Amino acid sequence: MESGRVAYSPKAAARFYVPLLLQAFSQSLTYPLVGAVISHGPDGVNALTAFSLGQVIQFMIGALAGGLIMTGMVFAKTRSGLSSFRRLNGVMMAVLLAVQALVCMHPFDTFIFGHLLNLNPHLTEIARRTLFFSIVMQAAFFMRNVPQVILFNAYASFEANLCTVARILLTGAFVVAFPMFGMVGPDWGLVALTAPIILEWLLSELFARKYERRLEDGGSASIMEQFRFTVPLSFGAGLLAVSPFMTAAFVGRAANPADMLAIHYVTLGIANPVAYAALRMQAVAIQFPPEWTGDRRLLRFAVVAGLLLGVIPFLFSLPRGKELENN
């Protein structure tokens, strides 16, 4: 067994998976929560629709680097490996932030939001502003990658969980406090999402320092090798991010498109956390490879986890669950 690697057991796998699970849930569930801040603004639910579409484009762009965390979990286990991973993360961040800024410019913004998604000019502007100022959020996600990889590789589940819980709690506090002080609308909604992510990144950096100092020297793959490893891992996240955009292009042409899109994104707020959580099983498979030919213990763990995750959308499809979702 590789030095420093934890042997597989259901408890070890669950302990490793829970921070990934919590992060996936927080990354998706916090967005519907912030809908309360946005929809209480002057444009009501229409602003929530435009805001959500701006976020969808952001996630599509970010998904092009969706495999970075897993790449770091494979290659960033030595000082030199972490250094190469940090450079790769920085390069991909710079390129994708530039792409995000470019998409906000004319004529791309009008083509995407006006032509493809069928938004009127006012809602197109809200979506464009959301996408543009989400560059800060996107940068925070990338900056978080490096310390999160260090924590995951060190099996520091407590610290990783603490960072994510702090993000959820701060988001919840904003959702309650902002409307009380009249701080509503898309711009304040974006603040309510972005500031907690920055907090999560800063806490991750703080907790990761002691584990980074413990890394040993050793060989490392080049940036290009790590990039080639990242691309196929990003494919699943990319498909997951593209599907809401494709669906929105059809929903936006239905009767009462703004209302229909708002319902669409509330529903995605339930489905997406489950999908992202299931996708994180890739990281568990990387961290706990088979220890002998025919070792299927992780397969059984994945099946049980998948069944438990599937219960969540099922419960919301029941009459009582529908009432809760509507409320």
Go through each PLM region and give its residues.
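Interhelical loop/hinge segments that connect adjacent transmembrane helices in multipass membrane
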Residues: 1-18, 125-126, 186-194, 199-241
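Interfacial/gating helices of multi-pass transporter permease domains
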Residues: 12, 16, 35-59, 122-126, ...
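Residue-level signature of transmembrane alpha-helical cores of multipass secondary-active transporters
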Residues: 16-24, 59, 134, 160, ...
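Small-residue-rich hydrophobic transmembrane alpha-helices
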Residues: 48-100, 144-153, 261-311
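Short runs within selected transmembrane alpha-helices of multi-pass transporters and secretion channels
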Residues: 66-73, 133-152, 163-168, 189-205, ...
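Short membrane-interface helical motifs at transmembrane helix boundaries
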Residues: 98-128, 309-327
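Alpha-helical transmembrane segments of multi-pass membrane proteins
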Residues: 121-147, 270, 274, 327
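Membrane-interface helix-loop junctions in multi-pass transport and translocation proteins
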Residues: 168-201, 316-327
